[in-house]
Amino acid sequence: MKAVEFVENPYGIRLRIFLQPKASRDQIVGLHDNELKVAITAPPVDGAANAYLLKYLSKLFKVPKSSIVLEKGELQRHKQLFVPAPKLLPKEIEQWL
């Protein structure tokens, strides 16, 4: 499976993410072992990193954060998410499609 995968039915993007919490800034770093490495400033405490990741991705894709689905990895750094019908495809992610 690729780090970023276009899904036709239902329409959207599936992301495999390696999360780096408590980073100095929010950014998409690049590929890390066939996953998209995402650095965020939120700490990995009481689900704060997951909530912040969803908020960060919702801004990038211009979708409501409630529409993004965390499919796997709620308590791990390795996560799989589904972004339904993104309104914008960020250039940092477009290159990995």
UniProtKB/Swiss-Prot annotation:
| Pfam families (alphabetical) | DUF167
Gene Ontology CC annotation, any one? cytoplasm
Write down the InterPro entries for this protein, in alphabetical order: DUF167, YggU-like_sf
List where this protein forms a coiled coil: none
Identify the domain of life: Bacteria
UniProt record similarity statement:
Belongs to the UPF0235 family.
* Descriptive protein name: UPF0235 protein HD_0778
Originating species: Haemophilus ducreyi (strain 35000HP / ATCC 700724)
